[in-house]
Amino acid sequence: MKRILIALVAVLVSVCACQPGPEKAAPADIAGHVIVIGLDGWGTWSFEKGDTPFIREMMKEGSYTLYKRTVLPSISGANWAAMMNGTPAESSGIIGNNAAPYFKPLVLTEHNAQPTFFHLLKQARPEAETGVVCEWGDFLNYADTLCLDYFQRIQDPEGHPDAIVEESVKYIKDKKPVLCFIHIDALDHMGHAYGQGSAEYYAELPLVDDRVRRIVEGVKEAGIYDDSIIILTSDHGHEGTGHGGHALNEIETPLVIWGKGIRKNHEITETVIQYDLAATVAEIFHLDKPQSWRGVCIPVFE
């Protein structure tokens, strides 16, 4: 009889061990919303003399580096793409500002596009609101618009410099996006027209600083600021009136990140390259990174 009881107990233990346990809850997002603001042509060389009171205040509110490196070549297409697709140009094939890659990318999605952070988010959560508001129309070539619920290019941004603020704030207040990328082109215009270190470039900096401030005010008015992370970044600097080479003035750019769960008044001392931005956004939403990505999460979280 004792042997029978022992055998029954063994069977019960075995059956219980084979039963699936309670599913583990998915970890909560670090923040519910990410707003990326890209300042085209904002080089680190301009920071010391630049009049940017709001940006400097946000550096105290979050984490920052003045030494983020571009991918090469130091042009807009390759670098905005790297921030979204997590890869360098030799992998993505995006070595210029053309709509199509110059050579076949190593990895393509079902959209025949690079796997961007927009794609990762939509794969995991199809209902998540995603959007882009940009002043440079070619920016949309690298975002995978099939993964966007909203995209708007500002027409004649030089003639209507406040339109980027108005459109961005309206979208944020109306839709409260989970992931949004806003592109501001004014500094690049000044760099090309008047050159690195020009009075005209420096005069534009406080105007751009104020546009960033007003967009952030819009995030607050939308009621999502306390559950948001805001990332301020740039694609390249300038050398003279151009870029595309490998001078430090072209390849060093600032990065500022602040908001929910971000370390305050923290200077990032680790190496940061453009494609690390994609990995950091993926970490915020606990998205699985593709094997093709080369970016690593920037250590800015509390």
Task: Describe every region a protein language model picked out.
Residues 2-8:
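Sec-dependent signal peptide recognition
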Residues 8-30:
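Bacterial Sec-dependent signal peptides at the C-terminal "C-region" and cleavage site
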Residues 25-31, 43-123:
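Active-site nucleophile/metal-coordination loop of metallo-enzymes that catalyze phosphate/sulfate
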Residues 34-38, 65-68, 82-84, 120, ...:
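Structural recognition of the beta-strand scaffold that forms the well-ordered cores
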Residues 35-36, 54, 204-248, 281:
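Metal-dependent active-site segment of extracytoplasmic phospho-/sulfohydrolases and closely related
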Residues 84, 246-288, 299:
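Substrate-binding rim/cap in mid-to-C-terminal beta-strand-loop elements of soluble/periplasmic
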Residues 92-96, 102-105, 109-161:
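Catalytic-site neighborhoods of secreted/periplasmic enzymes
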Residues 138-152, 169-210, 214:
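Active-site His/acidic residue clusters
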